[in-house]
């Protein structure tokens, strides 16, 4: 199974450390977090994209995806007035451009919290409008867009497989896909494999973590409560051939290399020998 490193955990170090560690530790690809100081889309547009492309070449590390920060700090396409919405969409479009230029496999976004007082019809109307515009843009430049479901601790919009199905039905674009961060279904008592059953070939990517079942905290495999060995067997048996990003975020960023090594070793130990 192909593995990806998420660069978010390296944000207090130069981004070259993330590429170097991904290469030396044996990851198969890298998922670029689009936040400062590493790969914020406007900074890439201003010239930083050259460094990202050079690092990918130097370390022979495929960029499997680009994940701009869209969960509300400061960009959230689901909350705020029209000026805020417009600014968020413009940033995501720029991120799609930068993903294309760095030869990323996809641009990954999420629908962050829409606010406690927003009624469902307004939430879904706004989501449909946003996704329609973004998908049209992605179609025009030839970039796949992945919508990530979040946990209920993070959002009240797209949080489970049925929400994803609703979003895909609202915007039936050939460039729109989804994925599963396995923490999200686990904390909601939703079977992870239901995503495979419901989404079929629209399931494009995986984020692998462990979970305590009661928060959105992302743990290294083996530190939580998930039956990961059994889950990975089912995923492999289902014929999944995409990347699995071991998504360490901010919990381990004091020693990102050490934990990235530990996470990869533990993850591969969960797999049958011919899949490691």
Swiss-Prot record:
Entry superkingdom: Bacteria
Cofactor dependency: a divalent metal cation
Gene3D superfamilies xref list: Divalent-metal-dependent TIM barrel enzymes
Residue sites binding a divalent metal cation per the record: 148, 181, 207, 247
Cysteines engaged in disulfide bonds, as pairs: none
Chain coiled-coil ranges: none
Molecular function in Gene Ontology: isomerase activity; metal ion binding
Active-site annotation: 148, 247
EC number: 5.1.3.41
Function in brief: May allow S.flexneri to utilize psicoselysine for growth.
Assigned protein family: Belongs to the FrlC family.
Protein name as catalogued: Fructoselysine 3-epimerase
Gene: frlC
């Amino acid at each position: 199974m192909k593995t990806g490193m998420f660069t978010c955990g390296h944000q207090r170090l130069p981004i070259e450390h993330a590429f170097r560690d991904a290469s030396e530790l044996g990851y198969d690809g890298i998922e670029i977090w689009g936040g400062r100081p590493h790969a914020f889309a406007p900074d890439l547009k201003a010239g930083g994209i050259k460094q990202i492309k050079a690092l990918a070449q130097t370390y022979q590390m495929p960029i499997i995806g680009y994940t701009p920060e869209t969960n509300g700090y400061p960009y959230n396409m689901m909350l705020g007035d029209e000026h805020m919405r417009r600014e968020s969409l413009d940033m995501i479009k720029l991120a799609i451009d930068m993903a294309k230029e760095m030869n990323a496999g996809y641009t990954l976004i999420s629908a962050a919290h829409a606010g406690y007082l927003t009624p469902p019809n307004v939430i879904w109307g706004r989501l449909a409008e946003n996704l329609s515009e973004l998908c049209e843009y992605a179609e025009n430049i030839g970039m796949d867009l992945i919508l990530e479901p979040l946990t209920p601790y993070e959002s009240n919009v797209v949080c489970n497989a049925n929400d994803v199905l609703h979003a895909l039905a609202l915007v039936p674009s050939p460039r729109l896909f989804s994925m599963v961060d396995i923490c999200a279904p686990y904390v909601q008592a939703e079977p992870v494999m239901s995503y495979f059953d419901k989404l079929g070939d629209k399931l494009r990517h995986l984020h692998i973590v462990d979970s305590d079942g009661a928060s959105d905290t992302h743990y290294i495999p083996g530190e939580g409560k998930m039956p990961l060995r059994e889950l990975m067997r089912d995923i492999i048996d289902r014929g999944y051939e995409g990347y699995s990003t071991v998504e360490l975020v901010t919990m381990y960023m004091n020693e990102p290399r050490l934990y990235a090594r530990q996470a990869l070793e533990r993850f591969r130990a969960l797999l049958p020998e011919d899949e490691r």
